Amino acid sequence: MPSEFSRTRRPGTVMTALVVLLGFLTLPMSMSGTTVAIPRIGEDLHATGAALQWVLTGYFLTASSFMLVSGSLADLFGRRRIFAAGAVLYAAGALGSATAANIAMLDVARTLSGAGAAGVMAGGGALLAATFQGAARTRAFAAMGTMSGIGLAIGPTLSGWMVGGLGWRVTFALFAVSGLLILVGSFFVAESRADRGPKVDRPGVASFIGGLALLMFGITQGAQAGWGSPRVLGPVAAGALLLVAFVAVERRSDHPVLDLTLIRDRRFLGWCLAALAVPVGSSGVLVFLPTYLQGVNGLSARDAGLTMLMLTAPVLFLPAAGGRLVNRGVPARHLAALAVLLLAGGNAWLTVLHPGVTPLALLGPLLAIGVGNGLVAGIIDAQAMSLVEPARVGMAAGFLNTVKGGGNALVLAVIGAVLTSLVQARTGSAELAGRIAAGDLSGPERALHAAQFTDAWHLVLWSVAALCAVGALTVHRLLAPAARPVKVSGEESRSRTGRTLSAKI
């Protein structure tokens, strides 16, 4: 390994990969599996609206808030140590979720799980980047994408089966067991850290976590309190100010939690944008469509989970295929742009959604979204990490995962709030809109409410499709190789200059 790293022991790289991949199997499963349990959780704990949505949003909020911090701490104090600490928090939060007596306790437990997930993801990504190089690194990150795809794919189906037969608490208990297995495995993983003294950028940590948390909290209150309410504008404004302060602090810090030179690299920024496009184009459908299918079409949790396999199954196989294509010479920028275009097309196509829609009608759009997600999932991390020197891989992995997790949190907060707001504009009742958005369409006006919910979905899908289309073009442009200077002879240069001046005159 390069001299920038100090190692305390050298267990096999295979064990490192296996333990990290177990983490990247469990965390996506926790995200996608929880989606099908939301209607049942709402019924059992008598919850609707923002409190119920927080079961999902709170997880992503803390995961994204702590991701960047976890990556930098991993570089300073040890990547394995942060990975293991994340596993402890994740398991504790999952156990708390399984035993929660009310929605408030469940929300708190889910936010704790999110903080743990940040340590597992940022520490795990940094461990892979520090352990593997070159084509082996590409294969390792492709395997990571494949495992994430497996978690996404089996999460709704497994959770749907357990929710229907055993209850949603068993789902969280399973996640707690997985967290403990990750913790045990971490003791067999090599430790690595950057060769510099541990110094924590406390102002940077505080301003980043506080800013992102306040911003997300304000957005989640939009539908219930009104977008012009002080309950929304206050936290959003305070969060934005703290994030501006974070940038100012990082510019002056000798040991920043985020070295801003990372995002000055146009190609690294391009891969971060590609990472953001994935949750924008897929997370809203993955999280909220099962609620629509259960509430409007009357599907069981198990059947809704099986339907989502049409989206999640491609993510099982395509990350590894994407990595192989890049290793065989296919330009990564073309693959990334194609993937984001597929996300755009899939969301536009999904406007075929209507009450009584058949699974066959959903096959095309869900496959398009799944293929777009899978193609790019296996190449983003490896391509981005290849642009970063070894001493900053933890910070870079943390930032990249912050973009992914923050994108997920923002997408869920915005789509959840916008769906509820659009339904409320049609029903005139915030309470009724919250119940409809949570999948509760019981009552004599069920058909009318289903139509209103569907109209709201269509507006959201068209908006997401437009964002992804713009994102695809931007990603392709940012990832373009730098133009090579053309050597021109002195005589030809003088001739060209003369022609240019003549043309201007």
Predicted regions and their residues:
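Intrinsic disorder in cytosolic terminal tails and internal cytosolic loops
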Residues: 1-12, 441, 445-450, 478-505
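12-transmembrane solute porter fold
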Residues: 13-29, 34-38, 49, 55, ...
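Structural signature of hydrophobic alpha-helical transmembrane segments
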Residues: 57-58, 111-118, 169-180, 235-239, ...
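Central cavity-lining transmembrane alpha-helices of secondary-active solute carriers
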Residues: 57-71, 124-125, 309-321
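Helix-loop-helix hairpins in multi-pass membrane proteins, especially solute transporters
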Residues: 67-204
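A membrane-interface helix-boundary motif in multi-pass transporters
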Residues: 164-176, 221-232, 300, 421-465
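Phenylalanine-glycine-rich, low-complexity intrinsically disordered regions
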Residues: 170, 192-195, 209-235, 247-248
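Short, Lys/Arg-enriched, Gly/Pro-containing loop segments at transmembrane-helix junctions
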Residues: 194-199, 255-261, 427-430, 482-492
